[in-house]
């Protein structure tokens, strides 16, 4: 190859390797900072308490809930607010007074907003939101979660709380991990580009890559703890039932022996 062409090729290769290393190391760095997810069973009820969930629903019949649209959730959609000034409480206030316009019903709305220390719920998970793709499946069948990005908010703690929330929603709604999607996944008709760079800090070049896979893997590990608790509880219940059955058998045996000796 001519020296100029070879030089350009090497630069492109170095750029690709640099992007891969950066995206891969971002998840690895966050994993080190957060620490590994424990592999011990966790009571789903205790997991719910850890979320520090506050319910502040949009008024029924108003704004994002002015039309009752029932939903059986099949997906979970992860967003980031891209709002440097609004915390979870500010977003709740905006939704509750219909300040965010758009979508099919005329008002934007989603189910949960997460910041470093709390989760606020805006919609029941049995109702459709307006957060992804107008009248597409992202709105019709998915629970929308927004991660805050305001100044002073700990991004890593927010992501971890979001991962725990997603795991809990997977558990209670029987949603498989492959149905946890980035907002990017749902194309928006009429937009260019149709796929939004969201949640932008979990994507590479505007698309899901190694960092997104790291995040989804962390959700899966939190979910596995909840399932493990069910399995451990089921095993313990089976052991207790077996012990009870054996005790009853022994008691019946001694009743027979006692009756026989008494007759003798």
Language model region names:
Residues 16-53, 151-264:
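Basic/polar, cationic surfaces and motifs that engage anionic cell-wall
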């Amino acid at each position: 190859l001519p020296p100029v062409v070879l030089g350009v090729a090497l630069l492109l290769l170095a750029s690709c390797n640099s992007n891969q290393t950066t995206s891969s190391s971002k998840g690895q760095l966050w994993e080190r900072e957060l620490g590994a997810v424990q592999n011990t069973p966790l009571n789903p009820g205790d997991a719910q308490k850890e979320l520090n969930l506050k319910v502040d629903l949009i008024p029924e019949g108003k704004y994002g809930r002015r039309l009752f649209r029932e939903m059986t959730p099949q997906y979970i959609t992860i967003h980031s607010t891209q709002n440097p000034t609004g915390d979870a409480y500010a977003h709740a206030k905006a939704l509750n007074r219909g300040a965010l316009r758009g979508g099919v019903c005329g008002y934007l709305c989603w189910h949960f907003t997460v910041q470093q220390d709390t989760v606020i719920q805006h919609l029941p998970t049995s109702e459709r939101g307006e957060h992804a793709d107008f009248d597409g499946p992202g709105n019709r069948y998915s629970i929308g979660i927004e991660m805050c990005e305001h100044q002073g908010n700990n991004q890593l703690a927010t992501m971890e709380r979001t991962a725990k929330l997603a795991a809990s929603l997977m558990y209670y709604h029987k949603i498989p991990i492959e149905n946890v999607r980035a907002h990017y996944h749902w194309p928006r008709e009429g937009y260019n580009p149709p796929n939004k760079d969201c949640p932008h800090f979990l994507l590479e070049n505007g698309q899901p890559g190694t960092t997104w896979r790291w995040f989804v893997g962390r959700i899966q590990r939190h979910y596995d703890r909840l399932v493990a608790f069910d399995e451990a509880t089921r095993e313990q219940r089976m052991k207790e039932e077996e012990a009870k059955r054996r005790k009853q058998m022994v008691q019946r045996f001694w009743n027979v022996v006692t009756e026989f000796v008494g007759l003798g």
